[in-house]
Each structure stands twice: as C-alpha cells, then as structure tokens.
Swiss-Prot record:
Residues 116-134 have a biased composition (Basic and acidic residues). Signal peptide: none annotated. This is Apical junction component 1 homolog. Residues 21-49, 61-136, 220-242, 264-294, 412-443, 539-574, 614-660, 855-888 are annotated as: Disordered. Keywords: Cell junction, Cell membrane, Cell projection, Membrane, Methylation, Phosphoprotein. Residues 616-625, 633-655 have a biased composition (Low complexity). One of its GO terms (cellular component) is apical junction complex. May be involved in the control of adherens junction integrity. It comes from Homo sapiens. The modification Asymmetric dimethylarginine is found at R749. The modification Phosphoserine is found at S52, S129, S468, S509, S512. It is found in: Apical cell membrane; Cell projection, Cilium; Cell junction, Adherens junction.
Amino acid sequence: MTRTDPPDLLVSTVYQDIKVATPGPASKCSPCERSVARPAEPAPFNKRHCRSFDFLEALDGPAMETLPEPPPPESAVPRARTREAEPRRRARSKSAPRAPPGLTPAPASPPVLPRRGREAQRAARAEASPRREPAYPALRALANELHPIKLQPQRGGPGRVAPLCAAAGRCAPPEPPAGPAPHVRCRLDIKPDDAVLQHATRGSRSCGPTEAAHWARPAPQFHGLTVPGPRHMALSRTPTPSDSYCADPRAFYCDGPLPGPRDYAERRSLPFTTPPGPTQFFYTEEPQGFRGSFAASPGPTFDAYYPRPYPSEELSGPSPRRMGGYYAGEVRTFPIQEPPSRSYYGEAPRAYGLPYGPRYVPEEPRAHSTARPFYTEDFGRYRERDVLARTYPHPRSSPAWADWGPRPYRTLQVVPPSDPDPLLASWHGGTGTSPPRLATDSRHYSRSWDNILAPGPRREDPLGRGRSYENLLGREVREPRGVSPEGRRPPVVVNLSTSPRRYAALSLSETSLTEKGRAGEGLGRNWYVTPEITITDNDLRATERPSARAWELPGGRTRPPPHAAPDGPTSGRQRSLEQLDELITDLVIDSRPTAGQASEPAADCLGPQLRRLLDSRPAGSGAPALAPPRSPPASAGSAEEPAAPGEAADASPEPSADEDDLMTCSNARCRRTETMFNACLYFKSCHSCYTYYCSRLCRREDWDAHKARCVYGRVGSVCRHVLQFCRDSGPVHRAFSRIARVGFLSRGRGVLFLGFPSPGSADNFLRFGLEGLLLSPTYLSLRELATHAAPLGSYARELAAAGRLYEPAECFLLSVSVAVGPGTAPPGTPALPAPAPRSHGPTVRKFAKVALAAGSPARPPPARSREPDMETLILTPPPGTAGLDQDGEAGRRAREVAFIHIQRELRLRGVFLRHEFPRVYEQLCEFVEANRRFTPTTIYPTDRRTGRPFMCMIMAASEPRALDWVASANLLDDIM
C-alpha cells in the first residue's frame, strides 16, 4: 500500500536524530508543579514510534503547545466535541481506514480537550481526515491504533529487541507517589471473553448521540482495509491477541501474584485481581493527557524508559495507570506479542539489576502525554492465524472453550456473527458429540507426537502444548506452494513400531494417504500423513489385543483414546497396544472424499481397510486364545484344505492376516506350525504355485507327492530335464551345437528354440532322443526375436538380455517350451484339485546356456574323476592365538577368534559353512561356547572363484599353524 500524501519528514518522530524547530509560533506552556518550563524545541526520541495516520500531526500541532491539568478521575464521561471544516482538504491515503459517518461511543471514553487557535475555527467536515484525529475522540485510546503499513516485526530472530515502555513524564499527581515499583511479568494462559473473540469479524459501527452502547446485538460483516485478527488462539501457551486485547484497559497489567488455570475457582470473588495480558508493551506518546475511565485502578505514572523482560522473578508492584478504554466495535489491528523460546537473562536472571534501568534520554520536566501501548507484529502472519482460527468447528461461546475455568475479568456479551466463515480441514477431528481434547490432558506419546508432526521446528517458535496440528498447518500456510506436483513438499512420514497385522494393512494402500486437496491450491486443501510402519514386535497374542476401540464417531472423525489408569505392570503392554491402535487410526483424519469430488472405490480407501483390520478382535472370553491351525492360502489344493473353484486367484497369502494366525508346512511328514509373522519371514514356496514349506529340505522331500497335483510345477520339471538331456546326450548335443553355430555365422546372435506340443512329447524326446522330436529346432536372431516379443512378454526381454551377453564362440542359448495341455495327473495318483499357479500361461518356457560341442565327434569325453592336483586347505587357529583350553571369558575369546578365522578363509573362496555344511558349523559353535573338542574334519567344497573343488581340513582345536614364510625354502634369501 502506498501513501498518496507525502509525510512531513522534518517533524516526523521516525527521524529521531534530526533536530528541527517546530513550524509555527510557539506559545508558552503552563507551568507544572515542578516549576520548570519546557524547552522550545522537542527533545529527540531514541525509540522508533509506530503511529497510525491519525497520529502523524499530533506531536507538532498547536494542541501540544499547551496542555491543561488533567481533570479529576470522576469525570469519565466523554465530552462531546465538534470539529470545524478544514479550509484546505488534504489528499486521502488509500490505505487509511475510512471511518463511517457515525460511531457508537464507548461507555468508558476519556475526556478530550478542545482545539485552540486555527484548529478551533475550522468548519466541521463530513469525514475525518486520515492524517488527523478521527471523528470520535474516544477511538484515540484504542490500544491497537496502528496501521498495517506501520507494523514492525517484533519476533523471528535472536536479535529481537524487547519492547520498551515510554513513560508519561507529565506533571506529577497531587499526592506524592509511593516510589517506583518494578513491573510484574503478566504471563497467563486464559481463555478470552466472547467480545474479544468476535472482535476481528466486526466492522465499524455508526456513531450517534446515545450515551450507552448496546453490546449484545448482531454486528454486520464489514470488510475494511485493516488486517483481520486471529480467532482461534486461546488454547496455546503463547499469549495471543485475544488474550492481550480485552475490554478492561487495566487488564494489561498484573497487580497480584500470578495464578494458574486451576486457581480461578478460588478467585471468582476477585474479578480484577489478576487480569490477563501480554508480557511486553510498547508505548508511544499521545498529544493529549487525560485520566483513565476506570478510577479503581491505582498506580503512579511513569517517567522513564525501561525494558519489560520475560523472566518472572521480578517483584510485584502496583500497575501503572491506564488511560482510555477500548471500543470493541472498531475494526483495527490487534496487539500481538509472543514470548521468545528462551529467556533473555540466561541462567542468572537477577544479575541484570532492576528492570527499570537508566533512562535513554535526559528527561525534562515538561508535560508528557499519557502512556499508551502499541503492539507490533508481522502482518504477513495474520493470514495463517486466520486460517488456524477457521479450523475450530465450535463457536467461541460454546462450552468447548470453557475448559480454563471462569474468567477473572469483565466480559462483554457479543452476539456471534450470523454467517461464519467456512470451516477448514484441521488436525483436530472434533465435529462429533464431544469437543476436541487437544490440550486438556497429556498422554505419554503426545510429546514425541509433536516432535514427529512438526517438520523442522525453529528454535524461536515455541511449540504449543499438545497442538501439533497448529504447528504443522502454520508452516504449511507460511510456505508458498506451487501448483505443479514437483513444487509440493511430500507429506509427512511417520515411523511407528507395530505388529505385522497393522503393517500389512497400512501397506495395502501406501499411496492413499497423500495430499488430497480441493480443486485449487488454496488454503482449503487437506493434508494426509503417510504412515511407514517398522515391525519390531512379533509375540502378540489375542489376549493382549484391546477389547474396545473408541475411534468411531458420528461424521467419520477420530478422537483421542481415553486416559488409561495405571493398574499394574501386567497391563502395561495392553495399554500400549490400545494407544498404538488409536494412534494409527488418528493418522487418518478423514478418509472420505471432500464435497464436490467423486467418491473413490471402497477398495482404494484406507479408512474401510483400517476399520476391517483394527476391528477384527477375537470373540468373547470363552473363545480360545489362538486361532485353529490352518494351512496357508497358497496350499489351497492340499488334501487337508481343498480349495473352492473360485479361490484360485485369491489363494495368495493375505498381507493383512492376523499375527495370531498359524501356517502349517505342506510337507505331510513335517506339518510344522508357525505363526504368520515367522512364516512370512522363513517359509519357502513352490516355484510354480503358492504352496509353502518350512524349509527347502521339506520342499524337496514333498516334491514327488506335490508334482502330481501341481501341473505347472510338473511341466517346469520336464523343461529342466530336457535342458539337462541336451547337455548329456552326445548326438543331441552335437546336432544342436551345429545348428546354433551355423545360425550365428549366418544371422548373428540369437536363440535356438525347441518346442513340444505336450508334456508327453517331451517325455518321448527324453526316451528316444532325436528320433522322438515332433518339431525341428529353430534358430532366431535377436532381431527376429524382437518381432515376436508381444506374445512372449517378459520372457522375450530376458532372452534378449541373455543373447547380448553370451559368448558365441563357446556356448549358445537353448530355449525349451512345453505346452501345458490338459491337467491330467500321472497314472496311479488320486485326482486332487490343483493349487493356485503363479502364472496362468498356456506354455512353460525355460532357457539355459549350453556349451558348444567339440569339433571332433570321436573325441572321448573328459574323465569326471577328481584331479590329483586338487588344492588342499588346512584351517587351524591363526598364529598368535593362545589359551584355547582356558576356562572363562579369556578362553572363549580365543576360541571365537579361531572360529572367525576359519569362516573368513572359507568365505574368501565362496564357501559358507552355515548353509553348505551345517553339521560342521554346529560343531564349531559348540567348540566356541562349551570348549567341546572334535576330531579334524575334511570337507570338499567348491571354490566359487575357479569353479573347481578343493579339499579342506578343519582342525579348530589344534595348535596354531606356523607362519608360511618360516617354512619357506628361501627363508635366508628373504631375510638377507
């Protein structure tokens, strides 16, 4: 906003260091009781003054020349005063608020002195000048008379200066003052009255000659040029504009001891003992002096500048005399002051002396104006405060706001506006029967919850008590966001610790909890949190599950869990599980689509999935603790649990299955039962269907019985046998090698395809060789393979990748395809339903690299016997290891070093004892733990680096092997 009328820079008090003479003739001032006259030119100010346009010419006008003595305190009724019209009309500022022609005077208005000289001869104007006094003089006593363009930021950095109190150095009152008394820091969490809460939405009222103002009446909605104040800041620890701006002008000070929120029941008879207020004030001088309209507020005037610090160790004292009242119907900026995150005094608050230290300017015994508070605030934050105010669904006069006890000050009954602003989505889902309980009680997880939800908290911004949504939404509004998805910040990710049941449920819809805003990028969008669950507990049982969940309320909102009383150490885990369930459900603020959006399918909404999952609690107390053992859904074709005809597609294990469910090994000779949690981690499945086994050994043992029912597994086994037969059979190997070699030389890299119309034809090939082939092998280059990529799908991509990597001079690619055909079981086996296959294609395909056959067909095959030059590795404890036979920790440590050395030597060659030689591994573990000796053991592993087997002798309990260089034949040459 720009000013249309240039300010008078020479007389403006913003330029404090320029000393100029006041324009116009200077008249004599009335002598004060101190009998010292004021100097001719004004003293420089060392504090910047924030003044509205109504206050620009107040200090340099003729009204400041002579000020009579203030009237007695009894004359609190405002005196009517008319203004003469100005001969010269000034240009009006576009940013100044336009006062309506009539305003209702406040009942507590200060006396106003008439103008003198030329000012008294001016004619009355239709509207007040924005640079002079308003039409109604009582408005000059407003504590928030400050234009938004002159707002000065008072917070936001470590260099913030505490506001100062500009004293009123006028003539002393007739009675001698009781002495300077230090201020008491007024820091009080209190709920403001209804008039304060509705102040931001009320406009200017018409001014009339009525003596009393009728407060309880609906106010029309005006839209002025002033910044709207916040309306929902009552529950925060931070003093809010509503706390600071109340109907009682003396409420900015605290005369007595500071009470807590629970002390109000005892202080109902003392309505003015501890009024609420901010912690710091900033005063500017006023061109007129008058006494306050409340005569019951004693206290001397001030005559010095001093900072108002935050620490509460200052002594109590009488409050200063506050002059003027408030007009609750005026739309103006609100006083806002927030405390810093830490004290300015550090560890020793009393080391800085008295709070009313030395004066910054030499004081003169001249008539000063009444001290008047002005509050400064960054007006860019008003928008976010207004948005936070619109997130609370209850009116300010409802019982939801009455959780701080009775109000210890006078209130004004103000009717709430008839058309409130639309409600925004917030983090307190409280439109149900009970109001949100964000700050009423504290739970043991709320502290970490605030830290989780506050993204990057700044040190100078104190967190509200239990109001994580306010900190989150406040920063969301504060940070501008682009329309493109790249410009948006990703949603908050919360890491929790829970059971696999909840982990699986939230994993079902990992993208459903994202930012789902309305059509625009305005402030009405809804933020959703993406939970990321980490599994840590796997021993949950049905008896430990919470018996009831109170997360379902009218409107689909969630509410915090009730506070569980500590009833013993045995129920600690039960309470933690209940709170964990409620905490997860609280993440979903409202999973329903907003108005105007198409409703999502029920399967895509996380809300119904969470409801179905978390409400699946066990039956009554008579039900068994564990669910009956059942086979996994994958083994739907087993004899113990036959599958229904339509369950083939749904036979995969449920990711949201309960952790108390059990899974049984499909091997009939094992039937091992494990919990669903352990089964998901350790169980192995068939490669062709969803049949699970507890280990690979059980899968191999059950293959003969399983392949009778698993059609795809049986056909896949045929493919593997064909590939092995092509390697082992000499005539087949030479024939296929010749075809592949000629195809590569003529058409480049490619694949040799061998197809069978049925598993029976493949069996004939295995029995009769080349004479049993029904289809001749075909060589396709990679370019030709690309033309058939559509029907092959991912298998074609795998073939192309392997075709670019193989070495044509040494091997070729052989692909075997077998059509599944009718799923007939082998003869002699009972007809059982087939388990659910992993793929439903009509053909099973497998490929492998096959080495090219030798050029001479008469060349004998190489002998398969073990070579005499096989490498031998002898493993003993490392050199320097001693004390293997000792008992205690020293001996155990020595044996552990020997064990680590043996494993390291084998792992360098790609051998893992635990998997390949588990018996030897168990012997070594017993040797380390219990010093149980065993005889030297010989194993024949394969070196993964060379592919050749070697002999390894493990002698863990023998003496350490001598150093290799000591046994060297050229030891002397190496030393010399």
